A protein has these predicted regions:
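A short beta-loop-alpha structural element at the N-terminal edge
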Residues: 1-4, 49-50, 108-121
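Acyl-donor-binding surface of acyltransferase catalytic domains
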Residues: 46-107, 113, 235-237
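Conserved acetyl-CoA-binding loop-helix of GNAT-fold acetyltransferases
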Residues: 51-56, 180, 186-199, 203
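Conserved GNAT acetyl-CoA-binding A-motif
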Residues: 62-72, 201-213
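N-terminal charged segments
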Residues: 1-63, 74
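A conserved beta-strand-loop-helix scaffold within acyl/acetyltransferase catalytic domains
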Residues: 132-181
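Conserved active-site alpha-helix within GNAT-family acetyltransferase domains
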Residues: 75-85, 191, 215-232, 238
Length: 240
């Protein structure tokens, strides 16, 4: 199951890269390279060959690849002199057959359908996570709702939260970018968004829901019935 969870994320990034024409891929790794956005600008799906990571780091330091790498733990990047860990996430999964959502849909949750919606999602996500999300990318990727759906939480004309569900080729639904802005925290918005995404996953007849949780978020998702598996780590590669 751990690999299926990772594959959902990698497949989502690959899907984005193809939609925006920025996917780099070969037998050893994949990358989405964008200048105008921090998301999903990175290298991923790296093969386990002995010298692959060193080659990728050389390409990054030569400005030929994005300087962010996401890999499963354990990884030799932990001890590499030119890498700096800045994000750890727990891989989690939930069998949707065990899930019944009792609460009603929250009317404040709106699906992204227009360019304006996409720009508002990007601004909300940027405020929630502290890195730049480009609305043009969101709009291009949101066009096929059978593959991916973007949502915002709008209350009293203020955008307070966001979330994404991505349906992969293994019939798993990945929950991504569930976040709240500083003004939206402590109001249960993340829980409401998670419930909405779970409903969409069940409506899609997905087998499992998968996600990648921070240390703070892991216990929240366990309350929904998610089980923890392995870990992902994201590193920034430093210049020489």
């Amino acid at each position: 199951m751990n690999q299926e969870i990772i594959n959902n994320l990698y497949e989502f990034w690959e899907y984005i890269g193809k939609k925006i024409g920025r996917l780099v891929e070969n037998d050893h790794y994949k990358a989405v390279s964008v200048v105008e956005s921090d998301w999903p600008n990175r290298v991923f799906s790296i093969s386990t060959g002995k010298d692959i990571l060193s080659e990728i780091i050389d390409l990054i330091q030569g400005k030929l690849l994005p300087n962010i790498i996401t890999v499963p733990k354990p990884t030799s990047l932990e001890s590499h002199s030119h890498s700096k860990l800045f994000l750890k996430q727990r891989n989690m999964a939930l069998n949707l057959k065990t899930v019944e959502i009792q609460s009603k849909n929250d009317e404040n949750i709106k699906q992204v359908r227009t360019k304006e919606d996409a720009l508002n999602f990007a601004k909300t996500a940027s405020d929630a996570f502290g890195y730049k999300v480009d609305g043009n990318i969101v709009y291009l990727v949101s066009e096929d709702t059978s593959k991916v759906q973007f949502f915002t939480y709008l209350q009293n004309n203020e955008y307070l939260g966001c979330g994404i569900v991505f349906f992969d080729s293994n019939n798993n639904a990945g929950l991504h970018m569930i976040g709240t802005t500083p003004n939206g925290r402590g109001k249960g918005i993340g829980t409401k968004m998670t419930e909405k995404l779970l409903r969409e996953a069940k409506a899609n007849k997905s087998e499992n829901c998968v996600l990648h949780a921070s240390a703070m978020g892991e216990n929240i998702y366990k309350k929904f019935g998610f089980n923890s598996f392995g870990e992902l780590e994201t590193y920034r590669i430093l210049e020489k």
